[in-house]
Swiss-Prot record:
Family per similarity comment: Belongs to the class I-like SAM-binding methyltransferase superfamily. rRNA adenine N(6)-methyltransferase family. RsmA subfamily.
Claim: Cytoplasm is one of the keywords in the record: yes
Gene3D superfamilies reported for this sequence: Ribosomal RNA adenine dimethylase-like, domain 2, Vaccinia Virus protein VP39
Xref: SMART domains: rADc
Main location: cytoplasm
Entry EC number(s): 2.1.1.182
Chain's gene name: rsmA
Recorded catalytic activity of this chain's protein: adenosine(1518)/adenosine(1519) in 16S rRNA + 4 S-adenosyl-L-methionine = N(6)-dimethyladenosine(1518)/N(6)-dimethyladenosine(1519) in 16S rRNA + 4 S-adenosyl-L-homocysteine + 4 H(+)
GO molecular function: 16S rRNA (adenine(1518)-N(6)/adenine(1519)-N(6))-dimethyltransferase activity; RNA binding
Entry keyword set: Cytoplasm, Methyltransferase, RNA-binding, rRNA processing, S-adenosyl-L-methionine, Transferase
Keyword set includes Ion transport: no
Name of the protein: Ribosomal RNA small subunit methyltransferase A
């Protein structure tokens, strides 16, 4: 099929066969897997996955690609013609394995959308902009550590698996890409009942990265609170571990009761 990649959908089609083979090896699909592919494009991963799987669910917003996939892979392919940001993944049950070459223009909101369904997910493998993957897996006190790191690390264990050069795509993106593996934790570090407060505190802490916690969290914690938590209020948001954010969330939650 000749298909002109659509800029508004952020389409960059994976065409490097050696990279495709390596990704399939990393994912390691087996018969019986409940696999969902987001943004299958022209089927670079779809075809080798269907060689193994009994059924593959795909989510694709581009109507032309949906028509092509329907004609090319009848039978074992179940196609959802919808924006992945609007898809209710709970409709597909549990034990989900989700993969995809995610459009870079919606990757961050899509990751947060998928986080809502973490209890139903076994693992996820995504092709993303390398810079985004580096932020996802970043450690405290490093330049890439920020809101994305903390919010996702609360729910997932994550690992950067493979760097993919721009020339592996058609058209080549202006950035390097990478595969990231995401596995949900048995229990989030910060309980889901506190997630709204957690997000509020993290946003406040990172609202002015150059300022100290004494300033950014002044509406949430007193000097005595910082001392009780054994957290230096002269630190900045990027210096705190997830465990320290969990302690802050507990303190603020208790203060509000």
């Amino acid at each position: 099929m000749r298909h002109t990649p659509r800029k508004r959908f952020g389409q960059h089609f994976l065409v490097d066969t050696s990279v495709i083979a390596e990704i399939i090896h990393i994912i390691h699909p087996v018969p019986g897997d409940r696999m969902i592919e987001i943004g299958p494009g022209l089927g670079a991963l779809t075809k080798p996955l269907l060689n193994v799987l009994d059924e593959l669910q795909v989510i694709e917003i581009d109507r032309d690609i949906v028509d092509y996939l329907s004609r090319t892979y009848p039978g074992k392919l179940v196609i959802h013609n919808i924006d992945a940001l609007k898809f209710d993944f709970s409709e597909l049950g549990e034990g989900l394995r989700i993969i995809g070459n995610l459009p870079y223009n919606i990757s961050t909101p899509l990751l947060f959308h998928l986080s809502r369904f973490s209890s139903l997910i076994t693992d996820m493998y995504f092709m993303l902009q390398l810079e985004v993957v580096e932020r996802m897996v970043a450690l405290p006190s490093t330049p890439d550590y920020g809101r994305l790191s903390i919010m996702l690390q609360n729910r997932f264990e994550m690992e950067q698996m493979l760097v993919v050069p721009a020339e592996s795509f058609d058209p080549p993106p202006r950035v390097q890409s990478a595969i990231v593996c995401m596995r949900p934790k048995a229990e989030p570090t910060i309980p889901l009942k506190h997630e709204r407060l957690f997000a509020e505190l993290v946003s406040a802490a990172f609202s002015q990265r150059r300022k100290t916690l004494r300033n950014t969290l002044r509406h949430y914690l007193t000097a005595d609170d910082f001392e009780r938590l054994e957290i230096d209020s002269g630190l900045r948001a990027e210096n705190l571990s997830l465990a320290q954010y969990a302690a802050i969330v507990r303190q603020v939650y208790e203060d509000r009761q």
